[in-house]
Curated annotation (Swiss-Prot):
<protein>
    <recommendedName>
        <fullName>Botcinic acid biosynthesis cluster B protein 16</fullName>
    </recommendedName>
</protein>
<comment type="function">
    <text>Part of the gene cluster B that mediates the biosynthesis of botcinic acid and its botcinin derivatives, acetate-derived polyketides that contribute to virulence when combined with the sesquiterpene botrydial. Botcinic acid and its derivatives have been shown to induce chlorosis and necrosis during host plant infection, but also have antifungal activities. Two polyketide synthases, BOA6 and BOA9, are involved in the biosynthesis of botcinins.</text>
</comment>
<keyword id="KW-0843">Virulence</keyword>
<comment type="pathway">
    <text>Polyketide biosynthesis.</text>
</comment>
Length: 158
């Protein structure tokens, strides 16, 4: 789906003054160099990232931002509660067991939805321009990959 959208956006004219910011939400664990023990999601997300970077390299005014959140945590975010599907029993149990640890002492692996949503909108609108450097931010050509650590640092959560 993301690749098809990006391919459609290849029609952007190179002479347009404004660049188009394309934000792809990937995930921690995505890799373009999978090994024998890489989970399927890491392999698929990595392949998608690679495909998007190839498209980006052909269109000068197409800016690609890849964000790799970790445990996406909606706890306490009442505004989106009505839109979150009911979790399965297994997912509910995992959140009950791991959620407090991820919010407590494993914060680098937690992605609270309110600041994550704000960050994604900031990327799309260009509000993060000039700030995308440092720990957790990797530039590959004209593409920018932001890990969960980078997102948390840029949003003042670390």
């Amino acid at each position: 789906m993301a690749l098809e959208a990006a391919k459609a956006l290849q029609q952007l004219r190179t002479g347009d003054l404004n660049a188009f910011n394309f934000v792809y939400i990937s995930g921690e664990g995505a890799t373009s160099n999978p090994g024998p023990f890489t989970p399927l999601f890491g392999r698929v997300k990595g392949e998608t990232e690679t495909g998007l970077m190839k498209i980006q390299s052909k269109v000068a005014n197409f800016r690609l931002f890849i964000v790799r959140p970790s445990h996406v945590d909606s706890k306490g975010h009442k505004a989106i509660a009505p839109y979150i599907p009911q979790p399965t029993v297994l997912l509910r149990a995992a959140n009950l067991a791991l959620g407090p640890a991820l919010r407590g002492f494993l914060k680098p692996y937690n992605s609270p939805t309110a600041p994550l949503g704000e960050f994604l909108v900031d990327l799309a609108t260009g509000a993060q321009q000039g700030r995308l450097h440092g720990d957790g931010v990797e530039c590959r050509g004209a593409s920018t990959i932001i890990s969960n650590v980078g997102f948390r640092r840029l949003m003042g959560l670390s």
